From Swiss-Prot:
This is tRNA-2-methylthio-N(6)-dimethylallyladenosine synthase. [4Fe-4S] cluster 1 binds at residues 21, 60, 94. The gene is miaB. It comes from Cutibacterium acnes (strain DSM 16379 / KPA171202). Residues 12-131 form the MTTase N-terminal domain. It catalyses: N(6)-dimethylallyladenosine(37) in tRNA + (sulfur carrier)-SH + AH2 + 2 S-adenosyl-L-methionine = 2-methylsulfanyl-N(6)-dimethylallyladenosine(37) in tRNA + (sulfur carrier)-H + 5'-deoxyadenosine + L-methionine + A + S-adenosyl-L-homocysteine + 2 H(+).
């Protein structure tokens, strides 16, 4: 049962643990902002199981393993909470929306359950749970407040997420997201651009536009060309160095977006284009509304307009009814597409989806074998593509937390314009770049998941983003969120 006794009079602490996609990471920044506005301070520890006065789990429901890991973690948290009277646990996000009636039944020590549509209610629900000494479960079926209208505590001083829409109008048979995020709701362009300008004024120099399907942005207010126009408008914002977006949908990806990418200098030459399957029959069963020929045509047009574009993708192995022939088609399309990285997943049955009740579910051993073959091919192609970068001069924006072995290898790490991960060795006398600073390097070796520049910096530019990072030092950090379900862009999933 929830415990409503606080044991100290200091400012209460919080930690947010994030599972899933970039949208969840952005939502977690909103959760952190709400809690700080309510008087909480971030707990400096990054260990998920370390005690804090409030621990919030922002969950994912795309795959079954995310469910299992969350409930496993909640099981461990029962003992932690028992040893720390007054501690509160909250579960939000997509899994909370899906399992609203069962979270507290499976984990009765949880204090608050909130969904994807009412993130802003969390502080009130925590207060109510403490006062009433009983769990508070509040799930809304439609959006209460657009997330970007809530306060935020951004994880990065120099890079930011910007939501352009929430929800999805597609009906992919394997996907549970539209049930949990609702129908698409678009923000007006002026509101989005005002937020971006405000972020740039704070030192942000890279933004990622977020939507479940960015290509359909604008349909709600009657402008099918709105996304391309938005990209071009971002090009007119002084101080905005890099613009990225995720995720598009092949069925709605149009040439005006390709032209906007090619003609807007601060829109980066990287594209994440989900394939899901190379088999037309499987795509039909998935209800993906495109076929492999259309997909390959998109890649051809992107590469014609943006020759050095790095293209990544998502692929599902073992969708119901997938035959050896279907899988061979996927392998053929992957070979032809030459992805710089691919996020490969084994099909996971999701409740209340058409695919979940389809006949001909593929046996697990077959799925595993195909998965391993696909990962091997994806890594081989990525390695070839990365080795082709050797000798190129690339611009790198250095980042905090990207190079997990930087201290041991004496390197610094960042992202190239095409979003490839680059590890850089500094020469004696080189200035040490701060996160957010931008340097030019020459690639000396390519590896399946990253590039290396062992020749030091060609030049280094101190940036407003680096200044913003420096100004943050000494503040309590929320640390790097725990992200499960979707890997960092550029790193194939194993």
């Amino acid at each position: 049962m929830p415990n409503n006794t606080l044991q100290h009079t200091e400012a209460p602490t919080y930690r947010v643990v994030t599972y899933g996609c970039q949208m969840n990471v952005h939502d977690s920044e909103r959760i952190a902002g709400l809690l700080e506005e309510a008087g909480y301070v971030p707990d400096p520890r990054t260990d998920t199981l370390a005690p804090a006065d409030v621990v919030v789990f922002n969950t994912c429901a795309v795959r079954e393993n995310a469910d299992n890991r969350l409930y496993g973690t909640l099981g461990h948290m029962a003992a932690v909470k028992s040893a720390h009277p007054g501690m509160q646990l909250a579960v939000g996000g997509c899994m909370a929306q899906k399992d609203k009636d069962t979270v507290v039944a499976r984990a009765p020590w949880v204090d608050v359950v909130f969904g994807t549509h009412n993130v802003g209610s969390l502080p009130v629900l925590l207060k109510r749970a403490r006062h009433n000494a009983t769990a508070q479960v509040e799930i809304e079926e439609s959006l209460v407040t657009f997330p970007s209208n809530l306060p935020a505590r951004r994880d990065s001083a120099y890079s930011a997420w910007v939501s352009i829409s929430v929800g999805c109008n597609n009906t992919c048979t394997f996907c549970i997201v539209p049930q949990l995020r609702g129908k698409e709701t678009d923000r007006r362009p002026g509101e989005i651009l005002s937020e971006i300008r405000a972020l740039v004024n704070e030192g942000v120099q890279e933004i990622t536009l977020l939507g479940q399907n960015v290509n359909s942005y604008g349909v709600q207010f009657g402008d099918r060309g709105a996304f391309a126009k938005l990209l071009r408008a971002c090009g007119n914002i002084d101080g905005l160095e890099r613009v990225r977006f995720t995720s598009p949908h092949p069925a709605a990806f149009t040439d005006d977006v390709i032209e906007a990418m090619a003609e807007t200098p601060n829109v980066m030459p990287s594209l994440h284009m989900p394939l899901q399957s190379g088999s037309d029959e499987v795509l039909r069963r998935m209800r993906r509304s495109y076929r492999s020929t259309k997909f390959l045509g998109i890649l051809d047009r992107v590469r014609e307009a943006i020759p050095h574009a790095a293209i990544t993708t998502d692929i599902i192995v073992g969708f119901p009814g997938e035959t050896d022939k279907d899988f061979a088609e996927t392998m053929r399309i992957v070979e032809e597409s030459r992805f710089s990285a691919a996020f490969t997943f084994q099909y996971s049955i999701r409740p209340n989806t058409p695919a979940g009740v389809m006949k001909d579910q593929v046996p697990k051993p077959v799925v595993q074998e195909r998965y391993e073959q696909l990962v091997e091919l994806v890594d081989d192609i990525a390695w070839q593509e990365n080795k082709a970068q050797v000798g190129r001069a690339v611009e790198v924006m250095f980042a905090q937390g990207e190079g997990r072995k930087d201290e041991a290898t004496h390197r610094v790490t960042g992202r190239a314009r095409d979003n490839r991960l680059v590890h850089v060795s500094l020469n004696p006398g080189d200035d040490v770049p701060r996160p957010g600073d931008i340097g030019e390097v020459v690639i000396t070796s390519g590896h399946p998941h990253h590039l290396v520049a062992d020749g030091g910096l060609v030049n280094l530019r101190r940036t407003r983003g680096g200044d913003a990072w420096h100004a943050r030092q000494g503040q309590v950090s929320q640390g790097t969120p725990t992200v499960l379900g979707l890997p960092t862009v550029g790193v194939p999933r194993h």
